[in-house]
Swiss-Prot record:
NCBIfam families: BchH, cobalto_cobN. InterPro entries: BchH (IPR011771), Cobalto_CobN (IPR011953), CobN/Mg_chltase (IPR003672), Glycoside_hydrolase_SF (IPR017853). GO terms for molecular function: cobaltochelatase activity; magnesium chelatase activity. PANTHER family: AEROBIC COBALTOCHELATASE SUBUNIT COBN (PTHR44119:SF4), MAGNESIUM-CHELATASE SUBUNIT CHLH, CHLOROPLASTIC (PTHR44119). It comes from the Archaea. GO terms for biological process: chlorophyll biosynthetic process; cobalamin biosynthetic process. This is Uncharacterized protein MJ0908. Belongs to the Mg-chelatase subunit H family.
């Protein structure tokens, strides 16, 4: 027998095929066939070895999911085959169409069609005959082969058996004596793994489900319908998860990747996946990692970037509850086909845990509501009595009252419904709380729970040795000192029927303040662990509900994503986690989803309105109007003096950062300039978006609040005001260029806009009544906007679904998904009450985001150039995850454009590369940018981190003059300097390009807020040292979390300009501590390490048609005037009793913090705070009645500002504040 040498090459993205081809090749290699597979993730060396192999190949074919872009060497491969006359058949996976592959095909249609069938049907039989067919067709082999044969496309798998119908399977289980009345858990896995017999992990899941007393239905399928026999997701669900037209499963563990909806027609999906709503069971995402289990175990990041996208981000589009890897790859052997042979194996403890959780979700569906126990957890940061129920934009106590009402209505045992949210908190304050200053013996005595040492010891002993050692090292012997009274750990909160309402334990930095300086990865306390174990094992909760943005559980140390049993969020979270969360914060909501397995229930933002002017600001505007309108010279001169006097009294000249107005320096010309600036500024202050109180879950807006909210949503997003101006024959561009001059016209347009909406409201926003509206002439553009208003209104009226779905989740229902976003920028996030998702990281930045980023960069550079007379060489930028998700990458676009680089997108809108913008096109130097990214951004956008790092390296290595490329200039200087110091060239080059810094892997935050909250600082040196300790880790392509504190200090010492952008006015920089902790911390660090305070900007894109780059201090003054001192804002907050007072306290905390780091609060501002919030009689009564702890904290903060020299108050003020503090403290203690 003559042995022929036939060579066949194959490039694949589907590694489960490798095992099948290995088995197939064993049977046919005797015919002299050489067959090699090249994995799409191959190295350059491996690719070149493959080219050497295929030089004399008879044919090369591919199976590339995603087309040519999936394989980085594709073009080289196609060119190589063409050059060497090798028949080339590039194919995607079945059901994909990629014309870019088709154009490179050099074999006939009949060959392609047959190969597609062999590859589509899969299995050893088909792959063996595929290779024989190709060897016969292209290698002159004369051996019989079989035609492609269909293999099962979908079905039920059970312990080596395959069932075509649900009835066949259930009948088989009955024959085995199984009790079908038990909970039924669905498992979904890929058909190709079934055909490849690569299902060890599925066998394990089946065993675990049965061992825990439930019935498994393990279904294999392909997401996409095809002509070869796949019926697709929708029909698969109907065939195997329904019986007699009703769902038979109680929970579903999905182990497939991407999105279940990808194979379902758009009309069946509508806005939300209707087929999943009909199934109506929780979908638990059990991730089967594309990486090796051993790598995951060792990894601090957890999952690899591919798993993050296809195993987490995309399933979130389905409303899946994201969990952890329950399986991954294990290498079986080195294959004869050129690649290692792998199998997917279970990670046993993770598989056990996901089944436990699936059973707990099934239990929510099966158990009677009257028998369920629910824990409701308020956040409490800082852990003080004025800040119980801290949640952004939400009246969380009132919302919980509404949740309790709905629970009682549905049969949950709730003994009493509090009169309102304030009464609920007052009741909680009668029991133990986290604020140890006010814990009395009586409170400790009547605590709802006490954990003895021996009880905690059982929980403690269930932890791994590593975790036990960490806890003991940081918190001492069990059960620790935190919340330990007479040897027992006290559980705060109240029990109301079958509902436990409590406060989340503190993170731990208050209990160990020195750890802020050296241990950002400080583990939670023994008490923290005990609290969550007590809820599960003693209170025996069926589910937990965390209320509002955001707690600390999801930020505890551990792997970044894809947690193990040694990660602290995983240790604590063993129950279904329902999490109402503000709709405009996708990033931190995503953190809760991925690190505490939360089902998000999105809630609306607070009611929004325009700020308006008040008090002396109104009078000043009138005086300016009078000045412009009068012809009388004497009156003009009088008004001029009055205007100057009022400007100085109100300190408005300081707001504009032009220095104080000095009468002697004022002449007619500069007075007119000043007047124009002040007039424009008043218009800005008048029209800033502010919240009118807080949102209450489930409560629809009505009347003026509804009209104002609709107005704020449409005014910029749909160019509402511009359309009205056009109808009224005004030039919108001219009006905006001279806002002060034309403010009366702008006011008129605003008023008409509001009146039109009020009139429309009389018709319940019925779009069929648009032509009956009389307020203004309706043109086609306005008609379209009003039709959109009708849709927005309907979605706002679905706000009751926030409460409905929160309680639905407690009944084990499916919560449908919807994209997160800021409603005033993107109405697609409405309605709320949804399990929101964020974005596809591969699309960041989108084309529109890059264009917005360009505008931001140009505005920033132009402002700096105008003010400083030069280009900034070094810029420090703060980059967060949530803004990136909301804007789809504005900040990333800005950074790339500062560097002089633009992304390359493929046809699907995914970023696939970078392109340098030539200097002649750029028209300016390339700016050197240092990023401080949040831990959340690091975790959610690893691909973007690598993209920016790649851009930096590209720019640093360009052949351009130093004066036109600051990155290259600084890189060259640093490398030379390091080599002189004896550092080797490789290290010098690598470290001199570190530009992206973040937290230590598995850690989060900037540390500065903890220092301020614990009063654990003396000067900006402390902030700088903590900022570097927490953020001194470098990230980029090829390195992850490298400790680089000296490099970070080096960058900080050279930064001239800092910036953090804000894309909406639904929040502001005084609303949360992270704004200051990151940006303020950066400013303090630059000031300390450089010896000079940097210029600091805020890029405001809240109105995308009018981007404004402002000085940080300007932004602070705007917020101070439009919110903190604005009666309209104050009265709105006061309506919310305890929570409104808590938020007043929060704002003063954060103003103080900004002043500590960045010096942006002037003495007069502190004085105004004292006058309004401490000494105003009405406010004092409000605080005393609703939340005296808030008044105590505000007074304490003001005294601290004086003591630290931040506020140069006189002795009289100091004494008044001291007296007030002692008075309030005495009042509180008297009531305890």
């Amino acid at each position: 027998m003559v042995i022929l040498m036939i060579k066949i090459g194959f490039v694949s993205t589907i590694d489960s095929d490798d095992l099948v081809f290995e088995e197939a090749y064993k049977e046919i290699k005797k015919y002299g066939i050489e067959f090699k597979i090249l994995d799409y993730k191959c190295s350059r060396k491996e690719f070149e070895e493959f080219l050497e192999f295929i030089k004399e190949a008879n044919i090369v074919f591919t199976k590339l999911m995603g087309g040519k872009n999936a394989f980085k060497y594709y073009d080289e491969l196609a060119e190589f085959c063409k050059r060497h006359n090798i028949p080339f058949l590039p194919l995607p996976t079945i059901s994909e169409i990629h014309p870019d592959l088709e154009k490179d095909r050099t074999v006939d249609d009949d060959v392609k069609n047959k190969v597609v069938k062999y590859l589509g049907y899969e299995g050893v039989y088909n792959y063996k005959n595929l290779l024989l067919y190709l060897a016969n067709r292209f290698g002159n082999l004369n051996v019989e082969y079989e035609e492609p044969r269909p293999m099962p496309w979908q079905g039920i798998y059970y312990k080596g058996k395959y069932f075509e119908t649900l009835d066949d399977y259930l009948n088989y289980l009955k024959e085995l004596g199984r009790d079908l009345d038990k909970p039924i858990i669905g498992v979904l896995f890929y058909r190709n793994w079934f055909v490849a017999n690569n299902i060890d992990y599925v066998n394990d899941l089946i065993d675990i489900i049965e061992n825990k007393g439930a019935i498994p239905i393990a279904v294999f399928s392909s997401h996409l319908k095809n002509e070869l026999g796949s019926i697709g997701t929708l029909e698969t669900f109907k065939r195997f998860f329904y019986k007699d037209g009703k769902p038979i499963v109680h929970a579903l563990i999905n182990t497939t990747m991407f999105t279940l909806s990808m194979g379902v027609k758009a009309e069946l999906l509508k806005d939300e996946p209707e087929f999943l709503k009909e199934l109506n069971v929780p979908i638990l995402q059990g991730i089967i990692s594309t990486g090796f289990i051993e790598d995951w175990k060792k990894s601090v990041s957890g999952l690899n970037p591919i798993d993050l996208i296809i195993g987490m981000a995309m399933p979130e589009f389905d409303g899946a509850i994201i969990h952890f890897p329950i399986g991954g790859k294990e290498k079986i052997k080195d294959g004869e086909v050129g690649v290692p042979i792998i199998k997917y194996r279970a990670i046993r403890d993770r598989a056990e845990k996901i089944v436990d959780l699936a059973l707990r979700y099934a239990n929510l569906k099966l158990k009677s509501n009257k028998d369920k126990k629910i824990a409701i957890i308020f956040h409490n940061y800082p852990p003080r009595n004025d800040k119980i129920a801290s949640a952004f934009g939400l009246d969380s106590p009132e919302s919980v009252v509404n949740i309790l009402k709905e629970m009682k209505k549905r049969g949950f045992i709730v003994d009493e419904i509090p009169k309102n949210g304030t009464e609920l908190i007052k009741k909680m304050l009668n029991y133990a709380t986290n604020d140890k200053r006010f814990l009395t013996e009586e409170m400790i005595k009547k605590a709802v729970g006490k954990v003895k040492k021996e009880d905690y010891e059982k929980w403690f002993n269930s932890l791994s040795e590593k975790v036990k050692q960490e806890l003991i090292k940081n918190w001492g012997a069990i059960p620790g000192d935190v919340m330990n009274f007479d040897g027992e750990l006290i559980i705060p909160g109240i029990i109301n029927g079958n509902v436990f309402i409590s406060v989340q334990p503190p993170r731990g930095f208050g209990e160990n303040p020195s750890a802020i300086y050296h241990s950002p990865d400080l583990p939670p306390t023994h008490y923290y662990i005990a609290f969550y174990k007590w809820i599960k094992d003693v209170f025996k909760a069926d589910a937990i509900m965390h209320i509002g943005k955001h707690g600390n559980l999801e930020w505890l140390p551990g792997k970044c994503v894809g947690l193990s049993n040694e990660c602290y969020p995983d240790i604590c979270m063993e129950l279904p986690n329902i999490y109402p969360f503000i709709v405009n914060n996708p990033g931190e909501g995503t953190q809760a989803k991925r690190r505490s397995y939360a089902t998000i229930i999105s809630h609306l933002i607070p009611p929004m309105t325009i700020s308006d002017l008040y008090g002396d600001l109104v009078e000043l505007e009138k005086s300016i109007d009078d000045y412009y309108e009068t012809e009388n010279k004497e009156k003009k001169e009088f008004l001029k003096k009055e205007i100057l006097k009022k400007i100085k009294e109100l300190k408005l000249d300081e707001d504009l950062l032009d220095g104080k107005v000095i009468d002697e320096e004022i002449n007619d010309e500069n007075f007119e300039k000043l007047l124009n600036k002040i007039h424009d500024y008043l218009e800005t202050l008048k029209n800033r978006q502010i919240n009118d109180g807080l949102h209450i879950m489930g409560v629809p807006l009505e009347g003026d609040k509804l009209v104002n909210m609709l107005f704020m949503i449409i005014r910029y997003q749909f160019n509402y005001l511009e359309i009205l101006a056009e109808i009224l024959d005004y030039s919108w561009e001219e009006l905006n260029e001279n806002k002060g001059k034309y403010h009366k016209i702008l006011d008129e347009i605003n008023e008409i806009g509001l009146n039109l909406l009020k009139e429309y409201m009389q018709y319940n926003f019925d779009e069929n009544k648009i032509d009956e509206l009389k307020t203004v002439k309706i043109n086609s553009k306005l008609r379209d906007v009003l039709k959109t208003v009708s849709t927005i209104y309907k979605n706002l009226m679905k706000v009751d679904e926030e409460i409905i779905n929160a309680v639905n989740a407690l009944e084990g229902f499916y919560i449908p998904p919807r994209v997160a976003g800021a409603p005033t920028k993107d109405i697609n996030c409405l309605p709320t009450g949804r399990n929101f998702y964020s974005c596809n990281p591969q699309e960041i930045p989108t084309k529109s985001a890059y264009e917005m980023g360009k505008k931001l960069a140009e505005d920033l550079i132009n402002k700096y150039l105008k003010e400083e007379g030069k280009y900034p060489e070094y810029i420090g930028v703060i980059v967060w995850g949530s803004p990136t998700m909301r804007t789809k990458g504005d900040d990333i676009g800005e950074i790339l454009y500062l560097l002089g680089v633009k992304p390359v997108w493929n046809k699907m809108g995914r970023v696939v590369g970078l392109e340098v913008i030539p200097l002649e096109e750029l028209g300016r130097p390339r700016i050197d940018v240092t990023l401080r990214i949040s831990g959340l951004f690091r975790d959610t956008f690893p691909n973007v981190v690598e993209l920016i790092d790649e851009a930096i390296k590209m720019v640093a290595n360009l052949d351009e003059p130093d004066e036109m490329n600051y990155v290259k200039k600084h890189y060259r200087e640093e490398v030379e300097e390091k080599i002189k110091k004896g550092i080797d060239e490789k290290t010098a080059k690598e470290t001199s390009l570190y530009r992206i810094f973040s937290d230590k892997p598995g850690c989060y935050g900037a540390g500065v807020s903890h220092l301020i909250d614990e009063k654990n600082w003396e000067s900006i040196e402390d902030f700088a040292k903590v900022y570097v300790e927490w953020g001194g880790y470098a990230y980029g392509k090829g390195y992850y979390g490298v400790e680089a504190k000296e490099e970070f200090i080096n960058r900080l010492s050279k930064i001239e300009l800092t910036v953090k952008n804000e894309d909406s006015q639904e929040w502001d920089i005084f609303e949360g501590d992270d704004f200051n902790s990151y940006h303020g911390g950066l400013i303090a660090s630059v000031t300390y390490y450089s010896g000079k305070k940097p210029v600091s900007y805020v890029g405001d894109t809240s109105n995308p048609n009018d981007i404004r780059t402002k000085h940080l201090k300007e932004e602070g003054k705007e917020i101070f005037r439009t919110k903190i001192m604005n009666p309209k804002w104050i009265e709105g907050m006061k309506r919310h009793g305890y929570k409104g007072a808590a938020d007043f306290s929060k704002y003063v905390d954060h103003m103080f913090a900004w002043d500590a780091t960045s010096g942006i609060i002037d003495d007069w501002m502190y004085e105004k705070i004292a006058e309004k919030y401490v000494f105003d009689k009405d406010m004092e009564e409000f605080f005393k009645e609703n939340n005296p702890y808030a008044l105590l904290n505000i007074t304490e903060r003001l005294l601290e500002a004086i003591e630290r020299g931040m506020w140069k108050a006189d002795e009289e003020m100091k004494e008044k504040l001291r007296k007030k503090y002692l008075e309030i403290e005495g009042m509180i203690e008297e009531k305890l």
